[in-house]
Curated annotation (Swiss-Prot):
It is found in: Virion. Belongs to the asfivirus p49 structural protein family. Its main location: virion. GO terms for cellular component: virion component. This is Minor capsid protein p49. Keywords: Late protein, Virion. Induction: Expressed in the late phase of the viral replicative cycle. The keyword NAD does not apply.
């Protein structure tokens, strides 16, 4: 019955193989139309994608509708019939996922979404990455530094068998490493006059990410147990503090990396190096990078993003208001999202109170990433270099007195930073140069 109905839907669409024959089609025209209609506010469904060989003129004019895709996608996974999309007759662009149905696959930490939805996600990732990051080293060459191998990723056709490889999804995804985070050399103590979380004003930035909604997102998106979600929702969990290693952090990182394929960064330096300002900056950048890698994978998932935002109204408002500042979030509803992925790094610095201007990247003869020249800047004397945060991550605005002649230039690393950057276990993959056009 399911296959008969699906075959009728695809009768005039024979240029692409049916989804049960190919788990990753090269191109699906109707799926792009459905995504655009669903996440761009078109309440009338998708644009017509076929209008020939139909007996009914109304059907030809109407085309493939959003409700058709809902029904069709759940035929491949009937057990998820009421998860994620709500009523098929609902006119709203999307509906939130009931929380009691989010945590139904706790043993394998797998989101409860249909196979068809995962196909769309993985197809979009594979299709867009080659144009965007030609200089990035492949994930294959650095698998020895990853605690989670691609072979442990869940398979599309065998969701219960987590040992099946999913190489077509994992081998094409590129992530930043610690060496690629723009360094911000600042003298003295970083003052947090307007902080977002638990930290006290004037405290050194030591790797905490106090914004609790970041962890709520990861819990909702990656099926962590409800008990873990409740703990994280109550307070900001320390991430990167060398003296605190909560099991929640390890569970979070392990679960998200297993599903998304994000490589886990290597271990921290030995205990004799875990002291001083330079180590704090290293630890902060390292863990900030880990979270940004995971979050970019979550935000890039068209099917998860709107539903999570409805479950977190505060973050929904903040992300909506940050759109003019962050081109990535403004284009997250579109298929080609990775062209602005570099804006994630400064954005998550702002979440963690790591005040810095939005960086500009350009190609250099040295083949290295750009860094800020902050040798003449101090926080206390040059407040105009710092974005003014007025109400949260979504309200960040650069001061109008930001100097027009401010240009990024290369800053040499200290001996301690060079020692960290030369350690092979500090990053999962390296980028020789970054030159996107913002």
């Amino acid at each position: 019955m399911y296959h008969d109905y699906a075959s009728k839907l695809l009768a005039d669409y024979r240029s692409d193989p049916p989804l049960w024959e190919s788990d990753l089609p090269r191109h699906n025209r109707y799926s792009d139309n459905i995504l655009n209609a669903r996440y761009c506010g078109n309440k009338n469904g998708a644009a017509p994608v076929y209008n020939e060989c139909t007996n009914s003129p109304g059907k030809a004019e109407k085309g493939l509708q959003l409700s058709d895709l809902r029904n069709f996608s759940f035929m491949l996974n009937p057990q998820h019939k009421n998860i994620g999309y709500g009523d098929a007759q609902d006119l709203e662009p999307y509906s939130p996922i009931p929380k009691d149905k989010l945590f139904n696959n706790l043993k394998i930490h797998r989101p409860a979404f249909s196979t068809h939805t995962e196909n769309l996600i993985r197809r979009n990732v594979v299709r867009t990455e080659k144009k965007t990051f030609p200089q990035v080293a492949t994930l294959k060459s650095t698998q020895k530094n990853c605690l989670t191998q691609p072979s442990s990723l869940p398979s599309l056709k065998n969701p219960k068998n987590i040992s099946m490889p999913s190489t077509r999804f994992s081998e094409h995804i590129k992530f930043f490493s610690y060496e690629d985070v723009p360094k911000l050399r600042i003298k003295g103590t970083i003052k947090h006059e307007q902080h977002l979380g638990d930290q006290m004003p004037g405290q050194h930035y030591n790797g905490y990410i106090p914004h609790k909604d970041v962890y709520n997102i990861l819990c909702l998106a990656h099926n962590l147990p409800a008990s873990v979600e409740k703990v994280m929702a109550g307070r900001g969990i320390p991430l990167g503090n060398p003296h605190v290693k909560p099991n929640i952090e390890q569970e979070l990182i392990k679960s998200t990396c297993t599903y998304t394929g994000v490589p886990i960064l290597g271990p921290l330096p030995s205990k004799d190096l875990q002291h001083g300002r330079e180590y704090q900056e290293f630890s902060a950048n390292r863990h900030m990078l880990q979270v940004s890698n995971i979050l970019h994978s979550v935000f890039a998932n068209h099917s998860i993003k709107p539903q999570i935002l409805e479950d977190i109204p505060t973050l929904n408002a903040q992300l909506t208001s940050i759109k003019p500042v962050s081109p990535f979030l403004n284009k997250a509803y579109q298929t080609h999202y990775m062209e602005n992925i570099v804006t994630l790094v400064p954005r998550f610095k702002s979440i963690a109170n790591y005040s810095s201007p939005i960086p500009h990247y350009s190609k250099r003869n040295s083949g290295q990433a750009e860094y800020f020249d902050t040798s003449k800047q101090t926080i206390s004397r040059h407040n105009n270099y710092i974005p003014k945060y007025t109400g949260g991550i979504g309200d960040s605005k650069l001061d109008s007195s930001f100097p027009k002649d401010f240009n990024a230039s290369s800053v040499p690393l200290t001996s301690a930073e060079k020692d960290h950057s030369l350690r092979g276990d500090n990053s999962a993959c390296c980028i020789s140069s970054i030159s996107p056009s913002l």
